[in-house]
């Protein structure tokens, strides 16, 4: 079965977060070019997802791409919004969350609004988790650690949301400005589970 049928046929998970968590590579591949990042994410997402499941991957890829050239949370989030259908359910959730971030005091209040309005979605659905990503970027744009930690504290698919926020904030700050406590543990090494000839690489060789 080829895309787009492969993302739809007998697939009750077509709007879950599985595509969104694959977005990072496309944001990295097209730094400062959110349109291209979203295009690549679309083709990837269509293999396994549909509609908002695909849009989530496009949204995050575009934000990561934009974060290489922007450092304003609202501009980065809007760059992601610009690459998905403006009236889709994901866009509505992102816009709602962005407004709550502007009008409420701190991430906890925003989390309460997200949970109140989007907590009915499954814990690994794209929409509610994307709202947490927006929250994490907004309140972490000047504090890498706070962005990741507060996103994870929001619950649901924590490893995915924390990673997405970390990718965006990492692109903003750049590797040299990330807190050492978050980078030293990697010992400058990438370990891959992909079945290729090289599974242990030092980062400078990549």
Language model features: what each stretch is:
Residues 53-54, 123, 158-162:
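Alpha-helix N-cap/helix-initiation sites
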Residues 199-205:
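Conserved small/polar residues in nucleotide/adenosyl-binding loops
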Residues 36-44, 57-58, 186:
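Short, conserved phosphate-binding/catalytic loop or strand-edge motifs used
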Residues 17-19, 53-55:
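Hydrophobic, membrane-interfacing alpha helices
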Residues 5-14, 23-33, 42-47, 61-155:
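Accessory "access/gating" subregions that flank catalytic or transport cores
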Residues 50:
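Active-site pocket-shaping loop/turn-to-helix segments
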Residues 137-198:
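Catalytic phosphate/nucleotide-handling subdomain of diverse soluble enzymes
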Residues 1-3:
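Well-ordered mid-protein domain cores that form the structural environment of catalytic cofactors
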